[in-house]
Amino acid sequence: MTQVLLNPSLEEAYHFLVKNMYNNLITLFGDCEIQYEGRAYSHASLASRLIIIKVDGSVIVHEHTKREPINWQPPGSVIVVRKESGVLSIESIRKRPKERLYIILRRLYYLTSAEVNSGNFDIKGTEKDIVDLVLENPNLIEEGFKPIQREYRIPYGIVDLFGYDKFGTPFVLEFKRSKATLQAVSQLHRYYMFFLESYGKARGALVSPGISEKALNLIEKLRLEYIDANRIFDSITNSSRYTINISNIQRS
């Protein structure tokens, strides 16, 4: 079921969010200011923005240009909605690492709630194909990434891709073509520890089109990183070498 409110009052929006945001996907468009406190500090002045709130606690804020959001919070964040004097606030709190996203809404143009179910996401291609893409354009991982060797053999196995970040830190990358699990995180951690002990510093990242909640929690606990492979797939959707199928999506 999908519900839509056009030009809702702050009072209407508050009750709508409290009723729906824990079970449905929420999208809203309105005039807002944003404050972020955590690993850094940022402030976004009053402007019209698109805000997406997912059932798992994810919050994403977009402006009118670029693919990447200007602010976001990951799954597992705690969301609190308050109706204050002349504004509606949405606060997203992440406990570890400690981060806080505070959105102050002064006007809403529309607000939607929808039941969205998960579908199958199949990628016709291997980890090798994805690594090939990264080797062609290392910045798909991050700016300044320098790949050194693929299938790098160490005592604990074969690393999919080894390189250095822009600061010269050894960077270990493990690629998965499907949703990453706890086993994938454990595998990456073994590789990461080898390079940490060998070089005194290291980074390790798991690259996949999805990750389980338990695996993501373990990634954060072990101070590893997760890279959403969908960012990479976005750049190749017009390539004949790959087919991306999203099926079994249920619509009400």
From Swiss-Prot:
> What PANTHER family does the record point to?
ENDONUCLEASE NUCS
Taxonomic source organism? Sulfurisphaera tokodaii (strain DSM 16993 / JCM 10545 / NBRC 100140 / 7) (Sulfolobus tokodaii)
**Keywords per UniProt:** Cytoplasm, DNA-binding, Endonuclease, Hydrolase, Nuclease
In the record, the note on similarity to other proteins reads: Belongs to the NucS endonuclease family.
Q: Where in the cell is it found?
A: Cytoplasm
Coiled-coil annotated spans = none
Give the function comment from the record: Cleaves both 3' and 5' ssDNA extremities of branched DNA structures.
Indicate the enzyme's highest-level EC class: hydrolase
- Cite a GO CC annotation: cytoplasm
What is the official name of this protein in its record?
A: Endonuclease NucS
| Name of a matching Pfam family | NucS_C
Provide any one GO MF term from the record. single-stranded DNA endodeoxyribonuclease activity
What's its EC?
3.1.-.-
